[in-house]
UniProtKB/Swiss-Prot annotation:
Residues 3-147 form the Globin domain. Keywords: Heme, Iron, Metal-binding, Oxygen transport, Phosphoprotein, Transport. This is Hemoglobin subunit delta. It comes from the Eukaryota. It comes from Trichechus manatus (Caribbean manatee). The keyword Hydrolase does not apply. The lineage of its organism: Eukaryota, Metazoa, Chordata, Craniata, Vertebrata. GO terms for biological process: hydrogen peroxide catabolic process. Red blood cells. Heme b binds at H64, H93.
Amino acid sequence: MVHLTPEEKALVIGLWAKVNVKEYGGEALGRLLVVYPWTQRFFEHFGDLSSASAIMNNPKVKAHGEKVFTSFGDGLKHLEDLKGAFAELSELHCDKLHVDPENFRLLGNVLVCVLARHFGKEFSPEAQAAYQKVVAGVANALAHKYH
């Protein structure tokens, strides 16, 4: 559960309605793989990840990033029960994929950076603070199976 004021919730939902999930999702996952190269081990089957350019232009990275952002957007509809909303993904990432849950926090921070880049001044300090709460809640929900 994420505790947002009505104003914070309005900021989060309002900005998310303007997100280009396909473009921003691919950018966010690509940036994660470039900035934190050890995360690439989970995506070796995606093909060429040999350089920043290769990663950012990799169609499989873009497609999976879109999938990640779609799931995040779905989670915004369940802010009162993020653990329930992400239960299946938590189980998949823990039991089958063995993803270090710290990576969820890293991806959340990259998501915030990507939103800031695209929304500029519209991504106010208040919007950033609200999104930081949400990405922390989502990371916690995704790590739930690990506890």
